[in-house]
Amino acid sequence: MGAGANNHEESSPLIPAAVAAPAYEKPPQAPAPEAANYYADGVPVVMGEPVSAHAFGGVPRESWNSGILSCLGRNDEFCSSDVEVCLLGTVAPCVLYGSNVERLAAGQGTFANSCLPYTGLYLLGNSLFGWNCLAPWFSHPTRTAIRQRYNLEGSFEAFTRQCGCCGDLVEDEERREHLEAACDLATHYLCHPCALCQEGRELRRRVPHPGFNNGHSVFVMMPPMEQTMGRGM
């Protein structure tokens, strides 16, 4: 009886049949957002840390803003500055070199510490050998520093890209850098005034002059106004 009653209750139409709950399907998870890539001085930065070119499979290097033979630069907002750079490179390369170093490594006495040795080597080379053969040896590391800081394409890499040869040398970062440094030296010896002018045009488009106070605000203290004591009524 008990078993029959239980079976009758289970089969009664008044008791709703138990419905199996549908299996809960976990919604697909959205892919984690990739870290934003930013660029600092021409080198990609992930999560605030600069990474090497190998981490991204080779970072394409930028071209110089103007060619080495573009004496008057480009017809843009820096046109007057390009003319000034051309005149300095022709008449007073020591001043142009000192200005380039001052923009590249701003600091007290940077201009004098670079301009004066360059002037001495310039005069010594012209006096002993009849041409400026000593100052390029002194100034070519600046070109290497500009190229590395702003991730610019070097002369050797540009040559291999145009000719399609020596690709293995470009892939080897250390060997490529040695070859680029040698090309920087050769560029200064063969086209020294043009190399200085190209570096000057590049730096003036990227770095403001240190004399502009680098954008810091200047507070001027005004003297107090004269105060007079009046006689009360």
Swiss-Prot record:
Membrane topology: Multi-pass membrane protein
One CC-aspect GO term: membrane
Tissue specificity as recorded in UniProt: Expressed in roots, coleoptiles, leaves, stalks, apical meristems, immature ears, embryos, endosperm, pericarp, silks, tassel spikelets and pollen. Highest expression in the pericarp and stalks.
Keyword flag Transmembrane helix: yes
Protein keywords: Membrane, Transmembrane, Transmembrane helix
Keyword Transmembrane attributed: yes
Transmembrane segments: 85-101, 115-138
Family stated for the protein in its record: Belongs to the cornifelin family.
Protein name, entry field: Cell number regulator 8
Protein location: Membrane
Classification via Pfam families: PLAC8
